[in-house]
Amino acid sequence: MASQSQGIQQLLQAEKRAKDKLEEAKKRKNKRLRQAKEEATADIDQYRLKREGDFRRIQTSVMGSQGNLAVKIEEQTVEKIQLYSSSFHKYKEGVLQQLLDLAYNIKPELHTNFQYKL
């Protein structure tokens, strides 16, 4: 019986060693998974920062060019207003005189299609 007891003890010890090895393997696996997850998260964060930087750089270049366009449009608008203003002052007297001549110098005439009937 002692040999059976000794055999059972050996089996129990072997079972315990196997259980310990399994637990240690699970711990190593969990540790590797955690480490892989942390590395993936770090890579994702790094990629996100890179893409956000690219986006900001492109956005700045586009918005900057739009700002330049706004300045150019403003300059062109001012130039056009000055041109129209100078044209107005240049031709104002002549146009006013033509309008007054048309209003005051009336020449009554019969229409060419008018037929006088008696």
Curated annotation (Swiss-Prot):
Q: Where is the composition biased (Polar residues)?
A: 1-12
Keyword Cytoplasm listed? The answer is: no
Pfam families per UniProt: V-ATPase_G
**Could you tell me the keywords of this UniProt record?**
Coiled coil, Hydrogen ion transport, Ion transport, Transport
Give start-end positions of Basic and acidic residues composition bias.
Answer: 14-26
Show the segment(s) annotated as Disordered.
1-37
Coiled coil ranges? 3-53
**Which domain of life, per UniProt?**
Eukaryota
GO CC field: vacuolar proton-transporting V-type ATPase complex
Entry keyword annotation includes Endoplasmic reticulum: no
The GO terms this record gives for MF are: proton-transporting ATPase activity, rotational mechanism
Query: To which protein family does this belong?
Result: Belongs to the V-ATPase G subunit family.
- Subunit field text: V-ATPase is a heteromultimeric enzyme made up of two complexes: the ATP-hydrolytic V1 complex and the proton translocation V0 complex. The V1 complex consists of three catalytic AB heterodimers that form a heterohexamer, three peripheral stalks each consisting of EG heterodimers, one central rotor including subunits D and F, and the regulatory subunits C and H. The proton translocation complex V0 consists of the proton transport subunit a, a ring of proteolipid subunits c9c'', rotary subunit d, subunits e and f, and two accessory subunits.
Query: What is this protein's function?
Result: Subunit of the V1 complex of vacuolar(H+)-ATPase (V-ATPase), a multisubunit enzyme composed of a peripheral complex (V1) that hydrolyzes ATP and a membrane integral complex (V0) that translocates protons. V-ATPase is responsible for acidifying and maintaining the pH of intracellular compartments and in some cell types, is targeted to the plasma membrane, where it is responsible for acidifying the extracellular environment.
Name used for this protein in its record: V-type proton ATPase subunit G 3
Q: Which gene is this protein's source? A: atp6v1g3
